[in-house]
Amino acid sequence: MNQKLTEEKKYNEKVLLIKRVSKKIPGGNYISFSALVAVGDRQGKVGIGIGRALEVPPAIEKAISRAKKNLLTVPLYKKTISHEVKLKYKAAKILLKPAPEGTGIKAGSVVRSILELAGVENVSGKIFGSRNQIVNSYATIKALEKLKKRG
């Protein structure tokens, strides 16, 4: 029991998006909530997940558990990424570049949150072509998957 509590607390969570969605059914509208959550340990592990439920808290819990199942290890090099990455995912084009010490995270929206949770401290990032936060977060994860380790 105690080991499970310490294992649960080692990841930081950030809710990136909560949407109220509705579906037309014969009796009217079926309303539920969708949550996009990123989890990370700020030491190179990060993951995202989507959860849907009738209320907001259960949707967030589902998203957190899915994000923990989809963790990715990011190869960090001197608190930044090892090399430049360009990637196209659906409509989103993402560009991530390493930055010198002291620069900070120069990226917007969900890209910044995901990189912070991954433990990257100095990076420059730009998203082109999409403002959809779900697509942008998946594009960021795919770009981080493409990174190769540098010695």
Q: Model segments located where?
A:
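Ribosome-associated RNA-binding proteins
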Residues: M1-G151
